[in-house]
Amino acid sequence: MAEYRFHPGRDWRFDFAIPSRRVAVEVEGGAFNGGRHIRPEGYLRDMEKYNEAAVLGWCVIRVLPGELLMLKTLRLVIRAVQNHN
């Protein structure tokens, strides 16, 4: 599922998610295109988001844009789904 809102009190969304298994994929492209993720405040917001996701029981896989459709990413997602209860 694309653009999944995972937090009950914030408007945080994962790029892709399997909600029934609490497995998510985040595409980290900002470092390469000058996006907000490389600025200190953007980086800190991302840290808060990922920490809250962990507290809520989510396994978050972070990939670069070029890795999204790679076999190694698919294998990571499969392993996460198999191992994350």
Walk through the language-model features, giving the residues of each.
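Nucleic-acid endo/exonuclease domains
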Residues: M1-N85
